[in-house]
Amino acid sequence: MKNNQANEKSKGFSDGERAAMKERAEELKAEAEKADGESALLAKIAQMQEPDRAMAKRLHAIIKGSAPALTPKTWYGMPAYAKDGKVVCFFQSAQKFKSRYATVGFSDEANLDEGNMWPTSYALKNLTAAEEAKIGALVKKAVSRAMRP
């Protein structure tokens, strides 16, 4: 009879074990989505012409370094970075829209608020160390929640 009781107990998982397995499944799903989004983003960057491709590659590194919690994805066919599924910042190539400059933009999810008016997009013709530093600081500020309600 003792064997039957032991077998009955071992047939199922405890609540704690089930919760841990559910958490792990969610982690694996999130990792897979992040990997898929990054693959799609890198494929879009590879399709760009120079100098947009070089700027987009560098921006990808800057954004990942400044806000590793953001998830790379594509948004309207352009590189974008999201938090909790919502786009925070993005890159628009000059060639796609036949513009004289590329654009680095931020959505309303970005915490860039400064008083009653602030910029949400920036023209980008060249990416030097000065612009890299500015963009890195903007991305860090964009993902901070200090000022957001």
Model-derived regions, located:
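Charge-dense, helix-prone N-terminal extensions
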Residues: M1-P149
